[in-house]
Amino acid sequence: MLKIGDTEFTSRLFTGTGKFANDKNMLAAIGASNSELVTLAVKRLDLKTGSDNILKPLQQRRVKLLPNTAGARNVKEAIFAAHLSREMLGTNWIKLEIHPDPKYLMPDPIETLAAARILCEQGYVVLPYVHADPVLCRRLEEVGCAAVMPLGSPIGSNQGLATEPFLKIIIEQSQVPVVIDAGIGAPSQATRAMELGADAVLVNTAIASSADPVAMGRCFAQAVDTGRAAFIAGLGNVSEQANSTSPLTGFLNV
């Protein structure tokens, strides 16, 4: 069982709501993935008109909603988005995203840390999306973040765990859950993330852009379970040399 803040999760696969061809595919894929936490952009919500309103069907599935501040370029905009999400959704959970560069969408570490400190002081359950920087993740933990969400590779790139050496350090050092977010493009990559000891992964593009999002959601659910089970079982040591599994010459002495 995974616990973040005051909430426990059975599934360690978190999903997103963007890039799906339609809401029907999105809801079906989320259901197939068994995900219990779904992130959605605050900028997408419009409770006054009901336009593009995906809240009701998501709430009917009883998944935990994690609003994110995607689109925020600085501390001020991120805090405004967090306040708006609390007013609209009645939740103090927030996925903190600040990326001023629209081309590469790299998270701004300085603005993210500053915003995280303020939001934690205001009583939010903060899950910051950051580069795979062990020092930054430690600082975010120190200011009160409930989890850290280091990237595997750029958002939506499907490049996998390009930052694996740094993810290993973060997982080793962290005293809060580590959720690997961004860049996971295949179920095998999600398995690898869990084998490293990550507490969960967040996957959106790889599922949403699949030819069959429902089947892909199911594949990711199985992949995450497999990776977690392998981590618990304990992977064998990696060696630079060969190690025989049976005697090579014993029969020659008979």
UniProtKB/Swiss-Prot annotation:
Catalysed reactions listed for this entry: [ThiS sulfur-carrier protein]-C-terminal-Gly-aminoethanethioate + 2-iminoacetate + 1-deoxy-D-xylulose 5-phosphate = [ThiS sulfur-carrier protein]-C-terminal Gly-Gly + 2-[(2R,5Z)-2-carboxy-4-methylthiazol-5(2H)-ylidene]ethyl phosphate + 2 H2O + H(+)
CDD domains: ThiG
One CC-aspect GO term: cytoplasm
Pfam families reported for this sequence: ThiG
EC assignment: 2.8.1.10
Annotated metabolic or biological route of this protein: Cofactor biosynthesis; thiamine diphosphate biosynthesis
Positions of transmembrane segments: none
BP GO terms, sorted: thiamine diphosphate biosynthetic process
Residues that, per the record, bind 1-deoxy-D-xylulose 5-phosphate: G156, A182, G183, N204, T205
Superkingdom as given in the UniProt entry: Bacteria
Active site residues per record: K95
GO molecular function: thiazole synthase activity
The entry's keywords: Cytoplasm, Schiff base, Thiamine biosynthesis, Transferase
Localization annotation: Cytoplasm
Subunit structure: Homotetramer. Forms heterodimers with either ThiH or ThiS.
Role noted for this protein: Catalyzes the rearrangement of 1-deoxy-D-xylulose 5-phosphate (DXP) to produce the thiazole phosphate moiety of thiamine. Sulfur is provided by the thiocarboxylate moiety of the carrier protein ThiS. In vitro, sulfur can be provided by H(2)S.
Family assignment from sequence similarity: Belongs to the ThiG family.
Official protein name in the record: Thiazole synthase
